[in-house]
């Protein structure tokens, strides 16, 4: 269960980061059962943009999707890296109108990001990370060529009104270079799991140094 305010915060945080305006066309590619479908479908009315509802058969066809993006003038596309890999496996399509590609749902391999930037240097590449339990995206990272030289792409910085912590099992902050678990606090953190209080109690815990009643995921 997530709050309406968390989902709205996710939508609003994308507007300044991606510099969205009434000139944009957002591709709605996700199933209605997935969290990312909410922002894909509902963010555009916030700033007067257009939503292009992509047919399911096209949304899962790498080359068909790119052709659709070009034909419909789509400016913002979110996709999983495995589909992006298929997009780059064949001849290039111009994508003159696309402004942003947001890989999400899987870890984006640095080499794949490198290949994308080589083919489409004019299209901004933003690594989007976030669990459904926290109202979709909680971090963005603008990928450039330098960042593709590492073993992993960074998760990035928190989205508006969310906070990220790297913590140990005792919920203590770990020092730089140490291994820890990524924990999320802020507006995006949901209520918990429906009819599963035990799982909720294990995953949504009191924030050890937050405001009274605040929780971490």
State the predicted function of each range.
Residues 1-3, 7-10, 20, 26, ...:
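A generic "structured core" feature
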Residues 2-27, 35-75, 145:
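Conserved AMP-binding/adenylation subdomain of ANL enzymes
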Residues 7, 118-127, 139-217:
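AMP-dependent adenylate-forming
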Residues 20, 30-34, 57, 107, ...:
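Conserved AMP-binding
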Residues 21-22, 28, 38, 94-97, ...:
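His-Asp-centered acyl/peptidyl-transfer active-site segments
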Residues 46-51, 74-78, 88-154, 160-163, ...:
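Gly/Ser/Thr-rich phosphate-binding loop
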Residues 82-84, 108, 189:
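Alpha-helix capping/helix-boundary segments
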């Amino acid at each position: 269960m997530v709050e309406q305010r968390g989902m709205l915060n996710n939508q609003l945080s994308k507007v300044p980061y991606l510099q969205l305006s009434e000139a944009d066309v957002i591709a709605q590619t996700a199933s209605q059962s997935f969290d990312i479908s909410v922002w894909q479908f509902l963010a555009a009315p916030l700033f007067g943009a257009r939503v292009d509802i992509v047919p399911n058969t096209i949304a899962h066809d790498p080359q068909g999707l790119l052709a659709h993006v070009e034909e419909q003038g789509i400016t913002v596309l979110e996709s999983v890296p495995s589909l992006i890999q298929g997009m780059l496996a064949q001849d290039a399509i111009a994508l003159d109108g696309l402004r942003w590609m947001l890989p999400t749902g899987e870890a984006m391999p640095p080499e794949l990001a490198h290949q994308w930037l080589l083919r489409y240097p004019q299209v901004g590449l933003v690594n989007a990370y976030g669990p459904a339990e926290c109202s979709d995206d909680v971090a963005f990272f603008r990928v450039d060529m330098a960042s593709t030289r590492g073993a992993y792409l960074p998760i990035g910085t928190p989205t508006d009104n969310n906070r990220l912590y790297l913590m140990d099992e005792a919920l203590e902050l770990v020092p730089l270079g140490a291994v820890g678990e990524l924990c999320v606090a802020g507006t995006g953190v949901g209520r918990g799991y429906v009819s599963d209080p035990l799982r909720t109690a294990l995953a949504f815990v009191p924030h050890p140094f937050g405001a009274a009643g605040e929780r971490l995921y």
